């Protein structure tokens, strides 16, 4: 595949602005995209993530949680992990390199989407161009293909909307947080709407030596080419340069008893992510009942890092061992999707049918360097004292190439879905998808190569019953597949004659629940009960540890309850509680009977907001997380915690000023972990002040 060069100017401005202003003289009907009415209501009443059609949430036979990012940014939240904190049975990881999330006990770090397009590269995502985040829980292969064992995370971006106001936002706070962002909108003609989100953020951290800088440039255009044809084009450039932070180690089964500001990296460490995406969506109304859509997504990531991180605690010397890695990573993903959606009736039955064709092409080129010792047999990277680390002790030897791979992935899929309305009480959702997936990895160091071809058929079935006007009961069953090489995009080429089983892993879910509206439809709740099984989990052959078999079993069972909406008057609520048991049931690597790492048995959140249309307003909330294990062998425990946050503000027609206080009780807690040596402390008490001017 030829090299593809994407730059902010050439793609962002030339595609959007030049096209828009070149057609400024054309007068056609107004774009159909319009602004949301009630911005204070935390509910999202309609979603396309679950069905890829505009479907009311209450008629989706699967749990789905939506979070509006505006309320989160007031607390200084600008990353995905923090944004999803408190969602029932969702936990965020602590990998400093990229976003890491577990949904219902299963890793979803490669199940991220942007406006329904796969975005699975390894980086930390910016939320300033995002309207809301939707978490679809359970297998989603019918519409999204591979992965998604516990669910998917879809970011819904800010769209150009006719008549939308512009705004400028400035923010400052603890640890030298300072940022300025602009959200600018204009309608050069009746049929063209433009929007530009851009900004810059700088911050230090309560963690010694940690800092970061974010940059964002995201123009978009909606162009009503004809009364029946709309073209939406979106571009985003994001850069995040930061200090990699691997937290603190575990000691004697608990996080080390050191200051939460203690760090063990090298002063020269850095991570520099530069991401670009270009998305195009053409929507053609064939008639009143049928629509044809074509969506193209191009994603490019350039990521470099130099990271010295802790690997273990040594009690005999009261020291922390370390290793150093460098990486140059480039990824290029191209996805093309064509869908036909329409409605019709047969024998009194109403159908909403969706058919689709999806083509994907992905390239990944990681080159990894490892530290070597200055003297033969010596220690490559100096260890540091646990309590008083001297980060000036650096690795001074050379870096040697330890891995240099090139991976190509080609995916093809067709799918069909029918939302069938039997009568006023009963609805059926049925879908089927067929995927072909091919991954080819070349090891440039060893001059070896291996390709794996796999295919899978993924079904989905749901039943919705509405015996009462405000209460909908549902039951669903779904299945997904995870092919070899479909996670981090790549496989490890083996020697000729390898007998590893590289067939896809398979996951199935059973879920029942009830979705209700209360208080004259002001408050919405969802109660869900589920069982999720990865029933051919990869594990080692007990007779030969070098051979991989598909004989393991991982299971998650749980209950979730969410509530969002308006209680009375100007009082709003959002929150939920999750209970789950996520364990490895069968395994040959010593994990059998162990809880899945970094997954709590229970978590909850509750935020109550008082927000009149104008004047003073306030919000307060609690986030509760139970204890978790830092590792798969369950040797180090992260204690459960509760965090109390609050916010107060004052708004008029054009101005909105608010101040947020995070972790009011200044409680020491541990947010997550990636291993026994890498546990991330939670943020201490901090303040964030935000001012927004709208015009």
Regions from the language model: what does each represent?
Residues 28-163, 480, 512:
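Acidic, small-polar-rich N-terminal luminal/periplasmic segments of exported/outer-membrane proteins
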Residues 128-131, 142-219, 225-229, 276, ...:
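Outer-membrane beta-barrel translocator/receptor signature
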Residues 241-254, 363-365, 438, 464-511, ...:
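Surface-exposed extracellular loop regions of Gram-negative outer-membrane beta-barrel proteins
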Residues 522, 528-533, 550-633, 665-668, ...:
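Gram-negative outer-membrane beta-barrel transporters
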